[in-house]
């Protein structure tokens, strides 16, 4: 007989760390005006840590992630209420410059999406568009970003090669480098390794672990092993609600709620 859960139960961690990179207060996302996809989520993300958002398909984790840098603004009929607090400002207000928000809170998507340009131009063109003309400065930006994404040694002799010829893992790390090149403080990753082979997945995880020294990372993943290996904190979503949020070690070994324990152990999903 199927287990019945009390979905009204919640266990939400209040991070002990004083430095909070980002937080939401009563965040709600609506589609088509009235369909509520995210139900009043309040949570905080500690600085320089990796937080994994987990939950079954349709749980709202990707919708919540996209709200954090206002990507849902691009969806017709989408509406977001509540607060998204970053550096003392509620960035979910109309007066906020959304393009500046997305520079500070970058996004890496599920499938690698390099532009149909050279490896070099995938990074350089953003800065050229923003007025950087000095070739030495562009070279420095490209090299630094590729090194941060652990890709420089593999591509430094082929920077004029089309990015479309790269392997999936390399292309995804190029997308990470591109996001890093504008010097964000937070990186959002929506299942960044789901389309990759195991070796590329491991490389992405290693890159994330290195990046958290300088960045705060929030990742959506369906891969429980990945969440347990690569994250410091884990948040379990179900049907648009945040059910449990705690240290990853606690979520995977001593969760407070039966629903969380059953999900991470594969009993449903």
UniProtKB/Swiss-Prot annotation:
Gene Ontology process terms (BP): phosphate ion transmembrane transport
Top EC category: translocase
Keywords: ATP-binding, Cell membrane, Membrane, Nucleotide-binding, Phosphate transport, Translocase, Transport
PROSITE patterns per record: ABC_TRANSPORTER_1, ABC_TRANSPORTER_2, PSTB
Cited InterPro entries: AAA+_ATPase, ABC_transporter-like_ATP-bd, ABC_transporter-like_CS, P-loop_NTPase, PstB-like
GO molecular function annotation: ATP binding; ATP hydrolysis activity; ATPase-coupled phosphate ion transmembrane transporter activity
Family: Belongs to the ABC transporter superfamily. Phosphate importer (TC 3.A.1.7) family.
Stated name of the protein: Phosphate import ATP-binding protein PstB 2
Organism of derivation: Lactococcus lactis subsp. lactis (strain IL1403)
């Amino acid at each position: 007989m199927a287990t019945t859960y009390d979905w009204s139960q919640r266990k939400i961690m209040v991070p002990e760390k004083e430095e909070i990179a980002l937080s939401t207060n009563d965040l709600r996302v609506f589609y088509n005006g009235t369909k509520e996809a995210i139900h009043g989520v309040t949570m905080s993300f500690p600085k320089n840590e990796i937080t994994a958002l987990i939950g079954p398909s349709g749980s709202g984790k990707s919708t919540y992630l996209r709200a954090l840098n206002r990507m849902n603004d691009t969806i017709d009929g989408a509406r977001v209420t509540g607060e998204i607090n970053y550096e003392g400002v509620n960035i979910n207000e109309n007066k906020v410059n959304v393009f500046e928000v997305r520079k500070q809170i970058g996004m890496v998507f599920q499938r690698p999406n390099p532009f149909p340009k050279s490896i070099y131009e995938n990074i350089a063109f953003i800065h050229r568009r923003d007025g950087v003309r000095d070739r030495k400065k562009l070279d420095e930006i490209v090299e630094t970003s590729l090194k941060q994404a652990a890709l420089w040694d593999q591509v430094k002799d082929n920077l004029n090669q089309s990015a479309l010829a790269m392997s999936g893992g390399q292309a995804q790390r190029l997308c990470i480098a591109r996001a890093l090149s504008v010097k964000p403080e937070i990186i959002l990753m929506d299942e960044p390794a789901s389309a990759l082979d195991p070796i590329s997945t491991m490389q992405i995880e290693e890159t994330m672990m290195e990046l958290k020294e300088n960045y705060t990372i929030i990742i959506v993943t369906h891969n429980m092993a990945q969440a347990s290996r690569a994250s410091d904190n884990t948040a379990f979503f179900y049907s648009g609600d945040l059910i449990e949020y705690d240290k990853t070690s606690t979520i995977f070994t001593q969760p407070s709620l039966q629903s969380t324990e059953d999900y991470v152990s594969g009993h449903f999903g």
